[in-house]
Curated annotation (Swiss-Prot):
Gene this protein is translated from: rnz
Protein's organism: Clostridium perfringens (strain SM101 / Type A)
Transmembrane segments: none
InterPro entries membership: Metallo-B-lactamas, RibonucZ/Hydroxyglut_hydro, RNase_Z/BN
Residues that, per the record, bind Zn(2+) 2: D65, H66, D220, H279
Free-text comment on the cofactor: Binds 2 Zn(2+) ions.
CDD domains: RNaseZ_ZiPD-like_MBL-fold (cd07717)
Record-given protein name: Ribonuclease Z
Keyword Transcription: no
Keyword vocabulary terms for this entry: Endonuclease, Hydrolase, Metal-binding, Nuclease, tRNA processing, Zinc
GO molecular-function terms, A-Z: 3'-tRNA processing endoribonuclease activity; zinc ion binding
Family to which the UniProt record says this protein belongs: Belongs to the RNase Z family.
């Protein structure tokens, strides 16, 4: 199960009734934060999402409405008692920006691992943290994160998250591979085990892969020909909808954003299950007034709202 909360749905500037766009995902008690504009940690308190268990922070681009909340959040996480490493993923230039923020944060009780302009990452989800791993034929990860270069006025990344479902234990396979019963439970947890100088791996006892959960996120971009393939068959596609009406197309083109209808067209082409719009212009008072524009193209389109929660379950 993946729990997804929209911490904010605004673009450009924080408004009294709308925080800046940010999303937090919770999987097995560990969290991933997508973007961190001014006021994000306030919304986290309002929604009770917690700070200490944030392992990965994904930044789409370096405009203030997506990153100005980061210094304060990093400080708060430090005050929460966290000592485990945090990964910050972002576009080209993210390291320089974080280094600047750290001038105001001379001491953090945890390490920051800044991953700049990367395209494909794999993580294991452990009880106390998520951990970056290198895959081989013997070990499978719990989570893959892929990025895509978008079309905005500054370097910008889209994100696609694949949550892998744990494979079922296969007793016949374990016996065939002569795996001692005392290590079965650890191998089922995808751990590597040594016993009597012999190494055992999870592939020796686990069955075939099962369908997981895919969530994709693109914000602050014009439509590109690569997006539909990148988001293909996502269970949930979170996309910017800065402008509700096609009458604002000239603004969308000039400012390198999207209209509701353009986002819906990407969702349709990508054959996603559900589209959730976010990053609304301050000029939009009620995004739901414009949702018909998206549904004309892709029926399962929804205008997100601050604090909205979506639960994505594994399917058999």
């Amino acid at each position: 199960m993946l729990n997804v909360t929209l911490l904010g749905t605004g673009g450009g500037m924080p408004m009294p009734n709308r925080f800046l766009s940010s999303v937090v995902m919770n999987f097995k008690g560990r969290k991933i934060l997508l973007d961190c504009g001014e006021g994000t940690q306030v919304s986290m308190r309002v929604n009770g999402t917690g700070f200490k268990s944030i392992d990965i922070i994904c930044i789409s681009h370096l405009h203030g409405d997506h990153i100005y909340g980061l210094p304060g959040l990093l400080s708060t996480i430090g005050n929460s008692g966290r000592v485990e490493e945090i990964y910050i993923i972002g576009p080209k230039g993210i390291k320089e920006v974080i280094d600047g923020f750290l001038i105001t944060l001379p001491y953090l009780p945890y390490k920051l691992n800044i991953l700049e302009d990367v395209s494909d990452l794999e993580f294991m989800v452990k009880k106390e943290k998520m951990e970056l791993v290198e895959l081989n034929e013997k070990i499978s990860s719990d989570l893959s994160i892929k990025t895509l270069e978008l079309d905005h006025s500054s370097p910008c990344l889209g994100y696609s998250f694949n949550i892998r479902r744990g494979r079922k234990f296969n007793v016949e396979k374990a016996l065939m591979n002569k795996v001692p019963k005392e290590v079965w439970s650890k191998l089922q947890r995808n751990e590597e085990v040594s016993l009597n100088r012999v190494k055992y791996y999870s592939y020796m006892v686990l069955g075939d892969e099962r369908k997981g959960i895919k969530l994709s996120y693109t914000t602050d971009t014009r439509p590109t020909e690569d997006i539909p393939g990148f988001i293909k068959e996502s269970d949930l596609y979170i996309c910017e909808g800065t402008y509700g009406s096609e009458e604002d197309m000239h603004k969308a083109i000039k400012n390198k954003h999207m209209t509701f209808k353009e986002a819906a067209d990407l969702a349709k082409k990508g054959q996603v299950k559900k589209l959730l719009l976010t990053h609304f212009s301050p000029a939009i008072n009620d995004p739901k007034e414009y949702i018909h524009n998206a549904r004309e193209v892709f029926e399962n389109s929804h205008a997100g709202s601050d604090g909205e929660e979506r639960i994505l379950n594994f399917k058999e």
